[in-house]
């Protein structure tokens, strides 16, 4: 609500009553003046309340006439100004009239009192009273006229406000009508645009449906074509398969007939097809005939074998030809098979245990009731599908001459089920040039390790080194080979990482000597373990066992650098125990002439099917280069009493 100004007009002159006024404002008794002052304040408060009530009533009336946001805003501004002016005018008139009336009444009362005390005359008092009454009448009349004037102004301002409101309402209505017209035009335009867009969408949809239907028809036709083609191809394939099955059936019948004929032929010609029992038991030693238990002859079929070093006489089953060279004697039924002299089985010669004889059954065979040569079970021999071999399943093993029943014995721990692989002496000739790649000969023997020894095995043998044996160049003797089923396993020949599919533990000779842990020369005469680990386990070995060079890894070299006796038999035992999968708890056992040493923390295998498969004696010089190769003399080593046992360390 707007502030209300309340001016107070003080009448200083009333018909030269200055003295009266001075008396009223002096220091005389003021009891009457105080009373009139209270009246004046009350009148002012009443006037303020009346003005406020008028203002509130006006506000309520104005609100009742408001009919919209625009009208309300205009009316509010105009009404506030009019109300403020009317209130101020009414209060001014009322206050002035009341003030003058109060002053006159006060003057009249004062005059009466003064006249009573003789200060003024009674006539002067009456005159003052009359002047006050006239002034009161004049003031009231002025108030009435002012009120009328103010009322007229109020009516005029209200009329103006109403006109402004009407104009504003008209303008707002016009604007609203214009907006509605424009909105209608815009809506019409948008509707027309929407209708055009809809028509275009409908046309595009119809076109898309048409294209889709055409594509669908094309796809269905293509599918029918492909289906028909596949059906045709399938029918052709069925016919082809049927035809192939017919051909295979015919071939199968022919194969069965051929197999039956082959079996019949083998039974009839078994004597000619059976190989003589070789000294290799594979899977037990094959009982092949050996013409001489001594050093192997070294004849060559063309131009003829050179006479082997040693005695001047030719070995057994050999004779000198016209050039003075020892060759296989065909008169004794002996021929050269590329490695040695053997019975000429192609021409009906067979080994009878002592010599090649014409028409006799091969060694370890006997004639059955039909007169055919068959494997003799009384001699512990059985047929393995290729030839007669020792019946290892029933405890028969090859001792170098015949199949014998296995016995006990051994060393290097608790052993059981000892198998003698070779009891007789055999000589490994190491003539000059035996070094690999340089020609000459190398000694090779191989035996299978039975299943009960495939996880822990002890190999024992005796070896003879002559007095002139040269240890200056290292060489291999033999030992264990490990692999997976059906695999030979690569664990020799300087196999590089990534190609080592097997493992091996062989004995190696060498002349390396040490002093205070340092290598000082090659004048020793020792043997030591020589190892290859497969790719899956080498990286998991302890540092002293890890193979860092391609050509194997040697251990215990210093300890056994002078372990061999020259010109005497030496006993060697090597033991190998597999580790538990995932653990380094395998063993290496090495013993020479009673000197023993064991290496633990070995990881031989990372798979349950990787185990000990063979004992192989591959004897040759291999471990020197340059001029040392030319220093290899014509020499030899001898073996005997080769045995394997189940080892329980």
UniProtKB/Swiss-Prot annotation:
Subcellular compartments: Membrane; Virion
Pro residues bias spans: 278-312
Cellular component per GO, a single term: membrane
Disordered: annotated segments: 258-325
Gene Ontology biological process terms from the UniProt entry: symbiont entry into host cell via disruption of host cell envelope
Keywords associated with the record: Coiled coil, Degradation of host cell envelope components during virus entry, Lyase, Membrane, Transmembrane, Transmembrane helix, Virion, Virus entry into host cell
TM spans (from-to): 37-57
Coiled coil (residue ranges): 184-268
Membrane topology: Single-pass membrane protein
InterPro entries: Exolysin_DUF5874, Polysacc_lyase_14
UniProt cofactor(s): Ca(2+); Mg(2+)
Assigned EC number: 4.2.2.-
Domain of life: Viruses
Intrachain S-S bonds: none
Residue numbers spanned by region Catalytic: 407-649
Residue spans of biased composition, Basic and acidic residues class: 258-275
An annotated Gene Ontology molecular function: lyase activity
Stated regulation of activity: Inhibited by Mn(2+), Cu(2+), Co(2+), Fe(2+), Zn(2+), Ni(2+), EDTA and EGTA.
Keyword ATP-binding recorded: no
Chain's role: During viral entry, involved in the degradation of the host cell wall at the site of attachment.
Domain remarks in the Swiss-Prot or TrEMBL record: The C-terminus displays the cell wall degrading activity.
Record's protein name: Exolysin
Species whose genome carries this gene: Paramecium bursaria Chlorella virus 1
Phylogenetic lineage: Viruses, Varidnaviria, Bamfordvirae, Nucleocytoviricota, Megaviricetes
């Amino acid at each position: 609500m707007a502030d209300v100004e309340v001016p107070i007009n003080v009448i200083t002159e009333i018909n030269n009553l200055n003295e009266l006024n001075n008396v009223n404002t002096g220091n005389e008794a003021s009891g009457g003046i105080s009373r009139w002052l209270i009246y004046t304040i009350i009148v002012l408060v009443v006037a303020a309340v009346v003005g406020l009530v008028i203002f509130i009533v006006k506000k309520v009336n104005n609100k009742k006439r408001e009919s919209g946001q625009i009208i309300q805003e205009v009316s509010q501004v105009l009404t506030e100004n009019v109300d403020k002016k009317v209130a101020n005018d009414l209060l001014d008139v009322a206050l002035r009239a009341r003030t003058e009336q109060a002053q006159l009444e006060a003057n009249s009362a004062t005059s009466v009192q003064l006249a009573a005390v003789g200060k003024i005359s009674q006539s002067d008092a009456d005159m003052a009273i009359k002047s006050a009454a006239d002034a009161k009448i004049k003031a009231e009349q002025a108030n009435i006229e002012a009120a009328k004037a103010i009322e007229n102004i109020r009516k005029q301002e209200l009329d103006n406000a109403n006109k402004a409101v009407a104009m504003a309402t008209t303008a707002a209505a016009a604007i609203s009508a214009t907006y509605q017209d424009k909105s209608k035009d815009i809506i019409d335009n948008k509707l027309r645009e929407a209708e055009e867009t809809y028509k275009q969408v409908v046309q595009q949809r119809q076109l898309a449906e048409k294209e889709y239907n055409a594509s669908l028809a094309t796809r269905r036709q293509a599918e029918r074509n492909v289906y028909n083609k596949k059906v045709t191809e399938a029918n052709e394939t069925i016919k082809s398969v049927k035809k192939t099955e017919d051909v295979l059936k015919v071939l199968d019948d022919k194969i069965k007939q051929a197999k039956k004929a082959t079996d019949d032929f083998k039974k009839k010609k078994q004597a000619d097809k059976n190989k003589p029992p070789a000294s290799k038991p594979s899977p037990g030693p094959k009982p092949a005939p050996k013409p001489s238990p001594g050093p192997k002859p070294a004849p060559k079929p063309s131009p003829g074998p050179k006479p082997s070093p040693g005695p001047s006489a030719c070995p057994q089953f050999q004779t000198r030809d016209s050039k003075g060279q020892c060759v296989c004697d065909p008169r004794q039924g002996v021929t050269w098979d590329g490695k040695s002299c053997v019975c000429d089985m192609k021409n009906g010669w067979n080994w009878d245990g002592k010599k090649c004889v014409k028409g006799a059954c091969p060694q370890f065979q006997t004639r059955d009731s039909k007169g055919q040569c068959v494997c003799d079970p009384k001699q512990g021999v059985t047929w393995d599908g290729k030839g007669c071999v020792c019946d290892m399943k029933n405890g028969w093993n090859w001792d170098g001459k015949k199949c014998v029943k296995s016995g006990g014995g051994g060393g290097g721990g608790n052993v059981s089920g000892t198998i003698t692989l070779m009891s007789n002496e055999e000589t490994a000739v190491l003539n000059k040039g035996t070094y690999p790649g340089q020609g000459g000969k190398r000694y090779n023997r191989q035996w299978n390790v039975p299943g009960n020894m495939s996880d822990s095995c002890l190999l024992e043998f005796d070896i003879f080194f002559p007095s002139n044996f040269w240890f200056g160049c290292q060489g291999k003797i033999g030992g264990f080979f490990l692999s997976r089923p059906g695999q030979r396993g690569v664990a020799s020949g300087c196999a590089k990482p990534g190609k080592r599919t097997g493992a091996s533990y062989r004995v190696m000779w060498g002349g390396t000597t040490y002093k205070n842990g340092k290598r000082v020369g090659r004048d020793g005469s020792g043997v030591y373990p020589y190892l290859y680990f497969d790719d899956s386990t080498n990286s998991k070995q302890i540092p002293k066992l890890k193979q860092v060079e391609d050509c194997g890894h040697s251990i215990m070299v210093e300890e056994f650098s002078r372990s061999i006796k020259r010109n005497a038999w030496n006993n060697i035992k090597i033991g190998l125990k597999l580790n538990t999968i995932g653990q380094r708890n395998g063993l290496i056992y090495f013993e020479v002439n009673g000197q023993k040493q064991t290496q633990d923390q070995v990881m031989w295998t990372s798979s349950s099917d990787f185990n000990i498969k063979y004992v192989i004696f591959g004897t040759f010089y291999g471990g020197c280069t340059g001029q040392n190769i030319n220093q290899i003399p014509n020499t030899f080593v001898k073996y005997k009493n080769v045995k394997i046992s189940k080892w329980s360390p």
